[in-house]
UniProtKB/Swiss-Prot annotation:
It catalyses: IMP + NH4(+) + NADP(+) = GMP + NADPH + 2 H(+). The lineage of its organism: Bacteria, Bacillati, Bacillota, Bacilli, Lactobacillales. It comes from Streptococcus pneumoniae (strain CGSP14). One of its GO terms (biological process) is purine nucleotide metabolic process. Catalyzes the irreversible NADPH-dependent deamination of GMP to IMP. It functions in the conversion of nucleobase, nucleoside and nucleotide derivatives of G to A nucleotides, and in maintaining the intracellular balance of A and G nucleotides. Transmembrane segments: none annotated. Keywords: NADP, Oxidoreductase. The gene is guaC. Disulfide bonds: none annotated. This is GMP reductase. NADP(+) binds at residues 205-228. Belongs to the IMPDH/GMPR family. GuaC type 2 subfamily. One of its GO terms (molecular function) is GMP reductase activity.
Length: 328
């Protein structure tokens, strides 16, 4: 039963340091392996239209970072796979669960992507299980990520259907309003939900949503994530596809949720919103800073690599690091 577990979120947790065993933080190894490939960091930008486009995906792949291309340019997906493979880069795309997606998956046999993410808001669904089975039948060598889910039962079912990884998080993101519109989700207790799901997972979990600081990456790993999907921290860069808007002489970039009216083009079943973020510098600068902060975290853990973060102790401090200020 969930009620037997403590309920907490990122701002409620502080990790407890161990004796440092490396001479320099630069010695800490931040790389992770997912499927048959190793990546520089255990993070992946959210597969959203205001976070990445084909150019950003290419930049990430060339830099040795994991990426998942969004599914909102359906006709562009096969040319995108070719573009990446022609350069010797991995292809990682998203699909939905509508009927026509089955034919699309079958068309990929000639040039199969290395990764496919089944990307729907409520991933604990018969439709997702059917799509996992279809992809595994048609493209047995493709690594399948399925989500999003928020319970151990969902993780077990998707893994049993053939998913190679599950994506955990229902509505904790900055531009997601699922919890407000429906009353459901992991918003406000995403880290506890991750821990709950990780206890039954036999395959990797991708924690998705609710990351507000770089320290939250280390906390996600401590509670069972192999990879962390991040939206708002990756939005608003010079390379980001979101529109640049000037307000009172300041530059902002738009960032909206995948189920917002701005993405859907119509106000129907809306569970996302649009916000403006102050324009940031280059994406690579953020990736470098994340790497350095994660190296510091590994050194505080008394470790040498990412997996060492899984074994540290922690305390539940109930918002005290932000003095209850959820905006931070």
């Amino acid at each position: 039963m969930l009620n037997e577990f403590p309920i907490f979120d990122y701002e409620d947790i502080q990790l407890i340091p161990n004796k440092c065993v490396i001479k320099s933080r630069a010695e800490a190894d931040t790389s992770v392996t997912l499927g048959n490939h190793t990546f520089k960091l255990p993070v992946v930008p959210a597969n959203m239209q205001t976070i990445l486009d084909e150019n950003v995906a290419e930049q990430l792949a060339k830099g040795g970072y994991f990426y998942i291309m969004h599914r909102f340019d359906e006709v562009g997906r096969i040319p995108f796979i070719k573009r990446m493979h022609d350069q010797g880069l991995i292809a990682s795309i998203s699909v939905g669960v509508k009927d026509y997606e089955y034919d699309f998956v079958s068309q990929l046999k000639a040039d199969a992507p290395e990764y496919i993410t089944i990307d729907i808001a409520h991933g604990h669904a018969d439709s997702v299980i059917s799509m996992i089975q279809h992809i595994k039948k048609e493209l047995p060598d493709t690594f399948v990520i399925a989500g999003n889910v928020g319970t151990p039962e969902a993780v077990r079912e998707l893994e049993n259907a053939g998913a190679d990884a599950t994506k955990v998080g229902i509505g904790p993101g900055k531009v997601c309003i699922t919890k407000v519109k429906t009353g459901f989700g992991t918003g406000g207790w995403q880290l506890a939900a991750l821990r709950w799901c990780a206890k039954v997972a036999r395959k990797p979990i991708i924690a998705d949503g609710g990351i507000r600081t770089h320290g939250d990456i280390a906390k996600s790993i401590r509670f069972g994530a192999s990879m962390i999907m991040i939206g708002s921290l990756f939005a608003g860069h010079i390379e980001s596809p979101g529109k640049t808007i000037e307000v009172d002489g300041e530059q902002f970039k738009e960032y909206y949720g995948s189920a917002s009216q701005y993405q859907k083009g119509a106000y129907k079943n809306v569970e996302g919103k649009r916000i403006l973020l102050p324009a940031k510098g280059h994406l690579q600068d953020t990736l470098t800073e994340m790497e350095q902060d994660l190296q510091s975290a590994i050194s505080y853990a008394g470790g040498r690599q990412v997996a060492d973060l899984k074994h540290v102790d922690y305390v539940i401090v109930k918002n005290s690091i932000w003095n209850g200020d959820a905006s931070h």
